[in-house]
Amino acid sequence: MPFHNPFIKDGQIKFPDGSSIVAHVERWAKVRGDKLAYRFLDFSTERDGVPRDLTWAQFSARNRAVAARLQQVTQPGDRVAILCPQNLDYLVAFFGALYAGRIAVPLFDPSEPGHVGRLHAVLDNCHPSAILTTTEAAEGVRKFFRTRPANQRPRVIAVDAVPDDVASTWVNPDEPDETTIAYLQYTSGSTRIPTGVQITHLNLATNVVQVIEALEGEEGDRGLSWLPFFHDMGLITALLAPMIGHYFTFMTPAAFVRRPERWIRELARKEGDTGGTISVAPNFAFDHAAARGVPKPGSPPLDLSNVKAVLNGSEPISAATVRRFNEAFGPFGFPPKAIKPSYGLAEATLFVSTTPSAEEPKIITVDRDQLNSGRIVEVDADSPKAVAQASAGKVGIAEWAVIVDAESATELPDGQVGEIWISGQNMGTGYWGKPEESVATFQNILKSRTNPSHAEGATDDATWVRTGDYGAFYDGDLYITGRVKDLVIIDGRNHYPQDLEYSAQEASKAIRTGYVAAFSVPANQLPDEVFENAHSGIKRDPDDTSEQLVIVAERAPGAHKLDIGPITDDIRAAIAVRHGVTVRDVLLTAAGAIPRTSSGKIGRRACRAAYLDGSLRAGKVANDFPDATD
């Protein structure tokens, strides 16, 4: 039956006193206590996975027990860091902190490869009073903290070791007001020191309602994810369940990467299903699943006709990716309209916009030169200057997005590219411990609006979040054109990195699809190898600070034995023809060398840093999502 959303009135989202995600879990524990709430598919011991389940009543009891223990050893307002492996205990730890009236900090087990530096940086910022982990991971966590000063070693609690009967001492904390922080969502950026977005209980509840409304959620819809819970997209997807009241299934990122068919099979219709399946995936996952997740002949039947939505909230999805995924899974009933290009960011809790539920992904082709000059001008797909742009759909209810000339803080008309500013009660309240950055990002005032305006409905004194993303409205839809900080400027001309990267990967089959990074570096910082290469067309000049284009690309499987000369020549030629710019260095690397964020995005700034310090050329592997098999 259709999900009746009692919190939406006259285009606004309003909650009764005492309403929170915690209150919703307690409600389901009373009225659906024996029904499944969360299922973890554990592939660590069985190839086909072992389901590990919690009912709503069990989930409530575990949450109250952990909360009671936290109330014994911490104070209101204390931060509680979650350093659990991705399993049921992680969700109990997160909710336990909320139940206790403490500030949750969703992080990760220190044994996660490549994340130790980030973990230290986050802990230095939030200074937690307690750590929640598991019995199995506790020794590794304590060992990690032994590397820190004695006064920075918080109490470590294994959530699975807290007895259920401790729940009897739980004290329901004071009702949160609109400023009460629920958790800190640390951004997934690759190079800068992580910043913790302060997400209030009101922000969280609002954004969950916005997602459900945008997807036309129904009772009986179930959620599915393999994304890490320390990432906003993974966390919010898991939190849809307490609002709808149906169950959520998850696995680890490694389980998906190693065998993407696991995710595909969980998307499929299950016995007893009364609704659809809602999932999320970054852009690379669609190609990965299409390449390696299609059932082999003789496999059990697969019915994907029930898939309601798979949100893609990372970099814009390409027409080729959509085509490959639909060709791979259309024969199994996958609905083309289920792929939902979306837009979101931690500063908005997560969700800003998505493709309407009844629509297929909308991908238009625009003139490259016009786009680089700040305008959306549609052209035929076969135009030599055509570049594809995927719509991010419509902005959610009770939130607003405007395209702004950042220098003058004025709204730009449709069709013009500017910085995306957003507003609504799902916006976080700032960055933890960073007041100046908080004001600069979260406390902006829109000085003038167009007529009509995309800010219609927002108050005149509303504050706006600067997203750092370029975008435009066109034909009623929001389009994301790129990150402000990632824009490549060569000889005074703008180039979007994803456009350059697409041209590079299309130039040669020896390049791994989706594993290309484009960025610029000053000429006098290029490595010696560039000046020794006649193809670079540049001579060393210590005073030359002009920005020069660099392409880093991972080799496709089986391409490591090929002569790199023709490959790099093809890339240089393709970019020269399509973009009118010279590539000074094409660096081909082994698989896994290009850094990625926790959501699977190319970490361009981290890649640039590794290029400049020489670690990329030295063969360092930095990928968070290794292309492993088991």
From Swiss-Prot:
Which residues form each disulfide bond in the chain?
Answer: none
Q: What is known of its domains?
A: Consists of two globular domains connected by a flexible linker. ATP binds in a cleft at the interface between the N- and C-terminal domains and its binding induces significant local conformational changes.
Gene name of this polypeptide: fadD32
Name the GO cellular-component terms. plasma membrane
Its subunit composition reads:
Monomer.
Biological process (GO), any one: fatty acid biosynthetic process
Has the keyword Disulfide bond been applied to this entry?
no
Instruction: Give the family from UniProt.
Output: Belongs to the ATP-dependent AMP-binding enzyme family.
Q: Its biological function?
A: Involved in the biosynthesis of mycolic acids. Catalyzes the activation of long-chain fatty acids as acyl-adenylates (acyl-AMP), which are then transferred to the phosphopantetheine arm of the polyketide synthase Pks13 for further chain extension. Can use decanoate (C10), dodecanoate (C12) and tetradecanoate (C14).
Question: Where, in this chain's numbering, is ATP bound?
Answer: T187, S188, G189, S190, T191, R192, S342, A346, D469, R483
User: What pH-related activity note exists for this entry?
Assistant: Optimum pH is 7.5.
Name the NCBIfam families on file.
Answer: FAAL_FadD32
Provide the catalytic activity annotation: a long-chain fatty acid + holo-[ACP] + ATP = a long-chain fatty acyl-[ACP] + AMP + diphosphate; decanoate + ATP + H(+) = decanoyl-AMP + diphosphate; dodecanoate + ATP + H(+) = dodecanoyl-AMP + diphosphate; tetradecanoate + ATP + H(+) = tetradecanoyl-AMP + diphosphate
- Keyword set for this entry? ATP-binding, Fatty acid metabolism, Ligase, Lipid metabolism, Nucleotide-binding
Give the record's free-text account of how this protein's activity is regulated. The acyl-AMP ligase activity is inhibited by the alkylphosphate ester of AMP, adenosine 50-dodecylphosphate (AMPC12). Also inhibited by eicosyl-AMP (AMPC20).
Pathway per its UniProt entry is:
Lipid metabolism; mycolic acid biosynthesis
Q: Which GO terms describe its molecular function?
A: adenylyltransferase activity; ATP binding; long-chain fatty acid [acyl-carrier-protein] ligase activity
Q: What is this protein called?
A: Long-chain-fatty-acid--AMP ligase FadD32
The enzyme's E.C. designation? 6.2.1.20
